[in-house]
């Protein structure tokens, strides 16, 4: 895997799980760091990036398959993620911050999905995270 194929959605999901595992005082900086890292990985991608992941001999997941339209939508989602991280630095608790990062990352994964199975997996992660965010209030 080269650096121009670093998945911004998986970066945000990873930071979301790290936020959930670490103490509360690390939350605000990790939320912003995750969004900035996802933004940087977006800028390293080109409009023809691919990231296949071979599960078995017969099954290969296409985690990244970009074109011009997906890059525009990804730019919107990454920018919203950074703005959300800046806005929410003092408003959320640890669980809301972690799940919000997971939600943002799964939405980026939906945009970048190159096959139906990857799309459905990221969609279900997004559905779980959004349900938690709604019922957390």
Regions found by a protein language model. Give the residues of each.
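Transmembrane helix-loop-helix hairpins at membrane boundaries of multipass inner-membrane proteins
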Residues: 1-98
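Alpha-helical multi-pass transmembrane bundles of energy-transducing inner-membrane proteins
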Residues: 98-137
């Amino acid at each position: 895997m080269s650096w121009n194929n670093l998945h911004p959605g998986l970066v945000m999901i990873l930071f979301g799980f790290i936020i959930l595992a670490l103490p509360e005082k690390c939350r605000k900086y990790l939320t912003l760091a995750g969004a900035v890292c996802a933004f940087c990985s977006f800028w390293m991608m080109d409009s023809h990036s691919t990231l296949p992941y071979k599960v078995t001999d017969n099954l290969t997941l296409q985690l990244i398959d970009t074109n011009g339209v997906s890059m525009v939508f990804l730019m919107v989602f990454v920018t919203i993620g950074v703005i959300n991280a800046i806005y929410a630095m003092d408003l959320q608790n640890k669980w809301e911050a972690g799940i919000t990062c997971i939600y943002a990352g799964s939405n980026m994964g939906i945009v970048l999905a190159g096959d139906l199975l990857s799309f459905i997996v990221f969609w279900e992660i997004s559905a779980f995270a959004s349900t938690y965010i709604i019922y957390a209030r």
